[in-house]
């Protein structure tokens, strides 16, 4: 669920998903066009991952996971819940690895500036 993903982001980056990632660059949030930096690419990959489990309720399905010893571990559940958890875990870890690229200028980045043709495909 979005609430759980936010907790994973905060665990990994020490930044809350809201406001730091909810509307960052061209992909964090609604997503579209070309990622602005490595942080935004994490969101692109997360969108692609969610696209692979489109039949699942990615925004609201509550899954099992734990945050221990610096690691996120996804628990057992339905196929959908396990896949959503993995998408969120991988994205949160990617955001941590990309902290050095985070630019405040991309917070609340206007969609109107995300018009370049896509550079990547899922």
UniProtKB/Swiss-Prot annotation:
Reported tissue expression: Expressed by the venom gland.
User: Could you tell me which Pfam families the record lists for this protein?
Assistant: Phospholip_A2_1 (PF00068)
Question: Signal sequence span per UniProt?
Answer: none
Which GO BP terms sit in this record?
Answer: arachidonate secretion; negative regulation of T cell proliferation; phospholipid catabolic process; venom-mediated edema in another organism; venom-mediated myocyte killing in another organism; venom-mediated suppression of blood coagulation
Q: SMART domains under this entry?
A: PA2c (SM00085)
Alphabetical list of PANTHER family matching this protein: PHOSPHOLIPASE A2 FAMILY MEMBER (PTHR11716), PHOSPHOLIPASE A2, MEMBRANE ASSOCIATED (PTHR11716:SF9)
Q: What is this protein called?
A: Basic phospholipase A2 9
Q: What organism is this sequence from?
A: Crotalus durissus cumanensis
């Amino acid at each position: 669920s979005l609430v759980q993903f936010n907790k994973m982001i905060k665990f990994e980056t020490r930044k809350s998903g809201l406001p730091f990632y909810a509307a960052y660059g061209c992909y964090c949030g609604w997503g579209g066009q070309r990622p602005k930096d490595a942080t935004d690419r994490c969101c692109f990959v997360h969108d692609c991952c969610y696209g692979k489990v489109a039949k699942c309720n990615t925004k609201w399905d509550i899954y099992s996971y734990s945050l221990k010893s610096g690691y996120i571990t996804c628990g057992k559940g339905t196929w959908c819940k396990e896949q959503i958890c993995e998408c969120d875990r991988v994205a949160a870890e990617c955001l941590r690895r990309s902290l050095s690229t985070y630019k405040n200028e991309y917070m609340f980045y206007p969609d109107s500036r995300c018009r370049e043709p896509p550079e990547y495909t899922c």
